[in-house]
Structure formats: C-alpha cells, structure tokens
From Swiss-Prot:
InterPro entries: Frog_antimicrobial_propeptide. Expressed by the skin glands. GO terms for cellular component: extracellular region. GO terms for biological process: defense response to bacterium. It comes from Agalychnis dacnicolor (Giant Mexican leaf frog). Keywords: Amphibian defense peptide, Antibiotic, Antimicrobial, Cleavage on pair of basic residues, Secreted, Signal. The keyword Secreted applies. Possesses a potent antimicrobial activity against Gram-positive and Gram-negative bacteria. Probably acts by disturbing membrane functions with its amphipathic structure. Residues 23-40 form a propeptide. It is found in: Secreted. GO terms for molecular function: identical protein binding. This is Dermaseptin PD-3-7. Residues 1-22 form the signal peptide. It comes from the Eukaryota.
Length: 66
C-alpha cells in the first residue's frame, strides 16, 4: 500500500509540474502572438501612411499638369 501511495504521489507531482510548464509555454506563446500582432498593426499603419502620401503626391502632380 505504501508503494502505491508513493507512486500515486509521484505521478500527481509530475503531472502538476508538467501542467505548470505547459502554462508557462502557453503564456510565452500568447505574448509572442501579441507582439507579432502589434508589429503587424504598426507595419500596416506605416504602409497606409506611405500610400496616402503617395496618393497626395500624385494628385498634386496631376493637378499641376492640368
């Protein structure tokens, strides 16, 4: 009976440690995903800014030609 208790405690302990490691990795992955999403939004904002600048330059050029 003592052997079974020790085995059960060992299995439970290893399960808790494994679960803890999974939670840490999940948190790290969520942080990486959040950083990537933030970077994508920043790049999209830069792209939109450059596009609007290009459109303004083109309209100024076309306006000066006409």
């Amino acid at each position: 009976m003592s052997f079974m208790k020790k085995s059960l405690l060992l299995v439970l302990f290893l399960g808790v440690v494994s679960l803890s490691n999974c939670e840490e990795e999940k948190g790290e992955n969520e942080n990486e995903d959040h950083e990537e999403h933030h970077e994508e939004k920043r790049l999209l904002g830069d792209l939109l800014g450059q596009t609007s600048k290009l459109v303004n330059d083109l309209t100024d050029t076309v306006g000066s030609i006409v």
